[in-house]
Regions:
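N-terminal auxiliary "cap/dimerization" subdomain that precedes the catalytic jelly-roll/cupin core
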Residues: 1-91, 205, 272-276
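Short, solvent-exposed loop/turn segments at secondary-structure junctions
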Residues: 31-32, 107-109, 126, 141-144, ...
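Short, cationic low-complexity segments
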Residues: 48-53, 156-176, 252-271
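Conserved double-stranded beta-helix
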Residues: 86-150
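Generic recognition of flexible, low-complexity loop/linker segments
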Residues: 124, 198-200, 218-221
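Residue-level detector of short, conserved catalytic/binding motifs and their immediate flanks
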Residues: 134, 208, 230
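Double-stranded beta-helix
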Residues: 146, 150-211
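Non-heme Fe(II)/2-oxoglutarate
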Residues: 216-276
Length: 276
């Protein structure tokens, strides 16, 4: 299901396949390797140890939280990612992205801060109600099946009970400004998936980049691990897809509104707007 690719030959066909559930893995390149190196370089200013062994330090939770905040939306990271998107022929017309986030997933799943923790089962589109959203995810350090991202591919077009109908991004953002993380950072799964559910763990290498629809049901793996995971992620939306309603199916998102304001124009940083 993870299809290797180096460059997009036909963007329309590529997006059609993404919005129908296909998951691509872009191969390692000079640009993506340089991006990983730059992230590691900035991490090294504050933490010079082995990334996978951060959890051995007594202050690992505080350090993880600090690193995530300090690395978020770093200009050189976004510039290099833009260069990557251009190199694979993804950029045609106006395009938008959210913040470039470096995430730390602890070896033991006990941290409270969302971007320095493991994430529960969700679709990213539950939080935006924008089904043209494409996700990009990549490891910075080596990963293993006990601490990675996992997909539930049989649920791409199968609904599950979730809290999107009562969740509000504005409430979360307001609480976050006050340092209050008690409100869920995203809508949550409200049912237990079967014990025999098919799970696809991601085992790509640093320098490779995963690309998939934000409508995929996915989560962090739940196992206790010997390694802390460092990864980065960003989401994109293209104006052409908004205009043409080229999108993944909305299976179970019940948000009352759409939340385009988290996306910004890649060129001039203006907020994305959606008109009926």
């Amino acid at each position: 299901m993870f299809v290797p690719i180096s460059q997009i030959e036909n963007l329309a066909q590529f997006k059609k396949e993404i919005f129908n559930g296909k998951i691509y893995v872009f191969e390692k390149s000079k640009i993506t390797s340089h991006l990983v190196d730059q992230i590691k370089k900035k991490i090294g200013i504050d933490y010079s140890g082995e990334l996978e062994k951060l959890h051995h330090f007594s202050n690992c939770e505080e350090m993880s939280t600090y690193l995530v905040a300090n690395l978020k939306n770093t200009e050189i990271f976004k510039n290099l990612f833009y260069e990557f998107l251009n190199s694979i022929n993804f950029l045609q017309g106006e395009s938008y992205w959210d913040k470039f986030v470096v995430r730390v997933a602890p070896a033991i799943n006990k941290f409270k801060y969302r971007e320095a923790s493991r994430i529960g089962v969700h679709r990213d589109t539950w939080g935006t109600n924008i089904h043209q959203q494409i996700n990009w995810w990549a490891p910075i350090s080596s990963i293993e099946e006990t601490n990675t991202m996992v997909f539930f591919p049989d649920y791409f077009d199968r609904p599950v009970k979730n809290s999107s109908g009562s969740w509000d991004l504005n409430i979360y953002l307001e609480n976050r400004k006050k340092g209050d993380f008690s409100y869920p950072s995203a809508p949550e799964l409200l049912e237990k998936l079967p014990d025999n559910v098919r799970i696809l763990p991601v085992t790509i290498k640093p320098g490779e980049i995963l690309c998939f629809s934000g409508s995929h049901l996915h989560s962090s793996s739940k196992h206790k691990s010997e390694n802390t995971r460092f990864s980065y992620e960003i989401r994109t939306v293209c104006q052409d897809d908004l205009d043409s309603k080229n999108e993944a199916p909305n299976i179970d998102c019940k948000l009352k509104w759409q939340f385009p304001k988290i996306f910004r124009n890649m060129k001039d940083n203006s907020p994305m707007k959606i008109t009926s």
